[in-house]
Amino acid sequence: MKLIKPYLLTAAAVLFVSCASKKEISSLKDVYKNDFYIGTALSADQIEEKDPKVDSLIRKEFNAITAENIMKSMFVHPAKDKFDFALTDKFVAYGEKNKMFIHGHTLIWHSQLAPWMSEIKDSTAMKAFMKDHITTIVSKYKGRIDSWDVVNEALNEDGTLRQSVFLSALGERYLADAFKLAAQADPKVDLYYNDYNNEEPKKREGTLNLIKKVRAAGGKVDGVGIQAHWRLDSPSLKEIEESIAAYSALGLKVAFTELDITVLPNPWDLKGADVNQNFEGSAKMNPYPKTLPDSIQNKLAQRYADIFKLFLKHKDKISRVTFWGVHDGQSWLNDWPIKGRTNYPLLFDPKLEPKKAYNSVLQLKETKE
């Protein structure tokens, strides 16, 4: 029997441990650290670190955070003369503690409004609300929050302005006013316009026109957020790439702000994130209640790989890629457009295990290094 020298065994053991350690510390934020931020949306429970395992995963994989809900007006400004910063303070402190990029979401949005805002009937009252709301919140976190969604989802699918309490009271000037107020409150913070489906031609053109008009009126717009609530088969990579080019041509930073990919049936051809669209469910509409078949896992992994290849191609134009949730179990897509379905749109399953899609995104970088 051939004897193996002890020092060779020692060297082999060291090499094995080294390789294992290298594999163990690989994470999304580490492998993409020279390309763009990798972020996630945090729920209230995650901000308060209620689940240590989830918290550990967040800190390991992500270097940017967005508040999923707690900065929307119904939560942060629940009464005319009352702000509630209990959770927003914890959110910002969490990001600072973990040295993360902190994104504020959102200042002006037609949905999830505080009920008292129904009292606002005229332009004077609306201007007063916007000044108070934007100035108070942005000033409070001046120098601590890195970027803001100033206006969210102001457009219809054809690129025209969406009807809202803001448009009704002030006309389209509310858009420029919002960006001006945010810039006055914190001149150094990056200001974004954020929307869904704005990689599609008509809405893309509407987004470009909106930003041009805001700038012409003296508003500061630093970037555009493409929410990226996508499907396995749409939008096309061509549409995404054309959008990156069109927005960056205006000198805008491009962020993919709410990335997830639905795998469930969609006979209504719904796209994006119109939360007012809801339908009745059936077993046929919820085909994977317990587990996702390998065939669909593979399609999801390939879709994510194709998308991230495109992101890497244009990494000089992309500031951040944020997933809308940490794991499948918390995804809003489990309840939209049908409540109670089981969707699988993210990179981690409800048990916090990485999926094939996670590996496909990670390996794009690891194979090159």
Where are these regions (language model features)?
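C-terminal motif of bacterial Sec signal peptides marking the signal peptidase cleavage site
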Residues: V17-S18
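Boundary/entry segment of secreted carbohydrate-active catalytic domains
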Residues: S21-A64, E68
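Acidic (Asp/Glu)-rich catalytic clusters
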Residues: K29-K33, P52-N63, D89-F101, V138-K142, ...
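Aromatic-lined carbohydrate-recognition surfaces of secreted/lumenal glycan-active proteins
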Residues: G39-A44, V150, F179-K203, A255-E258, ...
